[in-house]
């Protein structure tokens, strides 16, 4: 069963779909969607629980990079299909409305 498609969940899926072949980190997704962290991260966790998103830790040396590692997010094949279905079912308008 797919997750409930709230406006916020749709915004996250569509932001990930916009660059589906790239990895995204939380701050990037917050900027793209306008969602706050308290809304974004629970949505990502739900999407990952449903197999639509996968996440993993960035492979960097935090000391050399001068910053902590980021958790990266990417759509799975099922996530791409779900997001494309969502896009095709929308009738014009703003993707984040």
What spans do the regions from the language model cover?
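N-terminal helix-turn-helix DNA-binding core of bacterial DNA-binding proteins
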Residues: 2-39
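Short, charged/polar surface micro-motifs in flexible loops or helix N-caps
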Residues: 19-22, 50, 78-81
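Basic amphipathic alpha-helical segments that dock to polyanions
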Residues: 40-52
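Surface loops and adjacent helix of pleckstrin homology
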Residues: 45, 58, 85
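Beta-hairpin "wing" of winged helix-turn-helix
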Residues: 50-66
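Exposed loop/turn and edge beta-strand positions of beta-sandwich/beta-sheet ligand-binding modules
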Residues: 69
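Amphipathic alpha-helical dimerization/coiled-coil segments
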Residues: 78-97
